[in-house]
Amino acid sequence: MNRQQNPSPENRTSRVMTAWPDALKLFFFGFWMFFGIYYGDVLYIAQQYSFFSTAQGAMRPLWETSYGSLWIIGRALLQAFHSPFWGGALLSGMLTLISWLSGYVFRLRGRFGYLKYIPAFVFIYVVVYHGFDIYYQTETGKLLGIPFCILLILACQAVFVRSFSRKKLSGLFTPPAYNRPLDEWKAMGFILILGAGAVGMNEWQRPYVRPTARMQDWKGMKATASRSDLTYGTVAAYYAISRMEDENDVPKVPIDMLPPTSRPIYLHNRDGNLENARNYFLTDYCIASEQYPIAYELGKADLNTNGPSPLLLKQMVRICLALHKKEEARSHLNVLRTLPFEKDFIETYAPEAQE
């Protein structure tokens, strides 16, 4: 009678490692969660700072600048972050393709296969390091325009390499035949370590960015603030705004009586100089404290200096309605009608502007 032999520990380990999915899958789904859930609120606010209109001629001033066409493409792609879930899938997909093509073009395979993820991680670390600066008084089209440009260049290089080489391009989620299981494990470890490093950098160096963005979208302001460090000016300010919005008995503190920021915020203006963190939340604060004339002047100055954005246009609608400037409010609503995804806001405020 034949006895079934138990496989050796070495064989069991080999089968487990061989069956382990491709590292690219881990990268794609891991950073879909990173951009769609963990960093989704920040990228949603970036989308709200980014003006992209379908109206004829609206994007012409940007088109006529250096790299204007690329920044328009970047702004168009950034609109996907109106839903962070789908925006995260888009950005993670772009970075996955960049990693895949980098491995092919630069022959990063076998034990050096993990190096193909370096360009994507450079982008991720730059985004986390800059925090508010990825959208505050800067060209928001760069955020997705730059990875789009890199992806396009790599795709052209891959076509060129394939045309003059016998080396075939492996399937996107199929590990190349020449990769050992150990190589995939090494790549996964590399992804997990650098991914954890990106989260760690954000939590230690920019701990105020995510809670500020979440409160700026008015979702669970008080609950978010209670879990965050109120010694950062932007977090404390939006907590105060939430109280003024929800509780009528809370005093409306004038701007000049706001306490100074107790801990520094990494924030720069359009000229690259350090910006007072107060300027980041000042318009929202004036709206909440019913200082509408000051908010109006701030909004008009912002429109003239930085141009329109969905966030600023919606602020101006609220301000103009409070100051009974209904014709101007209708003008801003008409611009919002040319933007994608702003239908709910328009339906909420358009009736009041028509009265």
Predicted regions and their residues:
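N-terminal membrane topogenic signal
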Residues: 12-28, 110-112
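Aromatic-anchored segments of alpha-helical transmembrane domains
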Residues: 32-36, 119-131, 170, 177, ...
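Membrane-interface micro-motifs in multi-pass membrane enzymes
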Residues: 45, 49, 63-67, 115-164
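Transmembrane-helix motifs of polytopic, lipid-linked glycan transferases
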Residues: 92-110, 125-126, 154-159
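Internal/C-terminal transmembrane anchor helices
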Residues: 179-203
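Soluble catalytic regions of membrane-associated enzymes that act on cell-envelope
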Residues: 201-355
